[in-house]
From Swiss-Prot:
This is ATP-dependent 6-phosphofructokinase. The active site is at 127 (proton acceptor). GO terms for biological process: canonical glycolysis; fructose 1,6-bisphosphate metabolic process; fructose 6-phosphate metabolic process. Catalyzes the phosphorylation of D-fructose 6-phosphate to fructose 1,6-bisphosphate by ATP, the first committing step of glycolysis. Substrate binds at residues 125-127, 162, 169-171, 223, 245, 251-254. The gene is pfkA. Allosterically activated by ADP and other diphosphonucleosides, and allosterically inhibited by phosphoenolpyruvate. Mg(2+) binds at residue 103. GO terms for cellular component: 6-phosphofructokinase complex. Its cofactor is Mg(2+). It catalyses: beta-D-fructose 6-phosphate + ATP = beta-D-fructose 1,6-bisphosphate + ADP + H(+).
Amino acid sequence: MKRIAVLTSGGDAPGMNAAIRAVVRKAISEGMEVYGINRGYAGMVDGDIFPLGSKEVGDKISRGGTFLYSARYPEFAQLEGQLAGIEQLKKHGIEGVVVIGGDGSYHGAMRLTEHGFPAVGIPGTIDNDIAGTDYTIGFDTAVNTAVEAIDKLRDTSSSHGRTFVVEVMGRNAGDIALWAGIASGADQIIVPEEEFDIEKVASTIQYDFEHKGKNHHIIVLAEGVMSGEAFAQKLKEAGDKSDLRVTNLGHILRGGSPTARDRVIASWMGSHAVELLKEGKGGLAVGIHNEELVESPILGTAEEGALFSLTEEGKIIVNNPHKARLDFAALNRSLSQ
């Protein structure tokens, strides 16, 4: 394989630029040419494709976001969109693609592979909700950003004796809420993987104020449960009488310079993706499991909620985020006593 392309798709995540940089520089070191595709699959279909060299990725490792831009392009789920994209790839002499993104991006990579066009996926999403890997690019940075924000909210919460509901991103996964909640010493963490009793949440707030000598209370809420405003309303209906405030950290979690960990795993996975394409392997997703590089069939990792995937050698990679998140939730309850 002499010429490959790289794209980012879906929601942006800190560390994507580090992955792009690794793909480009590793490919060049292997004697391959690299092209960048702007705006993900939309740019592929539009032919927004251009050469990338070492100069173009210089100083990008520390930058958040993605300099290749990103977009959601549901039209690529249709055969017409897929064939149009492949036509553009062939027009530019591209023989394989590295796709950086979440489960939607993986579905696009899977379709390319089904059409006989090798594609390798790299997990890039702050949600950490991709099967076949312990960590996704951007998750560590998002957690650190959330912790920094919650620490600051605690300052004002304690100054005024208030309860804060802090809503964080995560869609159907509570990883950001759990990790950030534990690291910031949150009093309660609410995630979609675990049922909660709103009356118990309210009574816990009251008990902390009246019997534990606390003058403030922090609740970290994953957006997949409900919005922070809706949760606060339910708390009031359940009898909470504390001075309640809601803060939605929102898209701030996607921004910022990536942490050292995100830069390292992005570089590691980007380099390995190139190695796979050089060997002519497609339809695979790169991941990190037990601090080791692994690859899994993209078909299994692209299925939302998949609890495991298989390597080419048939090795099972357990990916049971539900159990892990419940274990973390139990840990936080024991620490918030």
